[in-house]
Curated annotation (Swiss-Prot):
Organism of this sequence: Arabidopsis thaliana
Keyword Oxidoreductase: no
Disruption phenotype: Dramatically reduced fertility due to a postmeiotic rupture of microspores.
Name assigned to this protein: Bidirectional sugar transporter SWEET8
Assembly with partners or alone: Forms homooligomers and heterooligomers with SWEET4, SWEET5, SWEET6, SWEET7, SWEET9, SWEET10, SWEET11, SWEET13, SWEET15, SWEET16 and SWEET17.
Keyword Transmembrane helix: yes
Tissue spec. comment: Expressed in inflorescences, embryo sacs and pollen, and at a lower level in stems. Barely detected in roots, leaves and seedlings.
């Protein structure tokens, strides 16, 4: 008979697969950058921000912080490698934008310093699992909610233009499923309030995007196409 812990593990594996799909979504953008040998007008911000988010969740899922969330660490570890690859490609082909290279390296250095500081505080200044989980979990939630919320800003543009041109349906749907899976994962066996908080809010935000999409879908001119530079930001939502 399957117990709650096994069910949680299975759902976590499903969440890993879906999250991997989200991490891989910008691959088309970077293939375009590689072929054109130029970053054009694509922004580096989503990928640099996701590096920070992944590092934090990798640490949160380790046994030193949370003993039952190793699947959170595994997918974010994979995501970290993918995002660093994206950033590396961006650095290779942003030669005509020297300030971008300087900014990226500066932000990455700052992120590493912050994560190292969080790790040191957690390991040497905090006592007890609850205190450690609360400290790291709250920080993770702040970053995760911000990343879930950023694509939802497109709702404002949709309402103003009465067009869903800049709100890709498939990404919104996958983000909704992803957040929903991780919300379910957080509720089974042992409630993980920090995975629950950010992904619960993420589920609501993604659902809001889908509702707005269906409200304005018919009023969108069919001949218009989605611009890659607008779509890329929507692929940054993870655990």
């Amino acid at each position: 008979m399957v117990d709650a812990k096994q069910v949680r593990f299975i759902i976590g594996v499903i969440g890993n697969v879906i999250s991997f799909g989200l991490f891989a979504a910008p691959a088309k953008t970077f293939w375009r950058i590689f072929k054109k040998k130029s970053v054009e007008e694509f922004s580096y911000v989503p990928y640099v921000a996701t590096v920070m988010n992944c590092m934090l969740w990798v640490f949160y899922g380790l046994p030193v912080v949370h003993k039952d969330s190793i699947l959170v660490s595994t997918i974010n570890g994979v995501g970290l490698v993918i995002e660093l690859f994206y950033v590396g490609v961006y650095l290779m082909y942003c030669g005509h934008k020297k300030n971008h290279r300087r900014n990226i390296l500066g932000f990455l250095a700052l992120e590493v310093i912050l994560v190292v500081a969080i790790i040191l505080i957690t390991l040497f200044a905090l006592k007890g699992d609850f205190v450690k989980q609360t400290f790291v979990g709250v920080i993770c939630d702040v970053f995760n909610i911000a990343m879930y919320g950023a694509p939802s800003l497109a709702i404002i543009k949709v309402v103003k233009t009465k067009s869903v041109e800049y709100m890709p349906f498939l990404l919104s749907l996958v983000c909704f499923v992803n957040a929903g899976i991780w919300t379910t994962y957080s509720l089974i066996f042992k409630i993980d309030y920090y995975v629950l908080a950010s992904n619960g809010i993420g589920t609501f935000l993604a659902l809001s995007q889908l509702i707005v999409y269906f409200m304005y879908y018919k009023s969108t001119p069919k001949e218009k196409t989605v611009k890659p530079s607008e779509v890329e930001i929507s692929a940054t939502e993870r655990v």
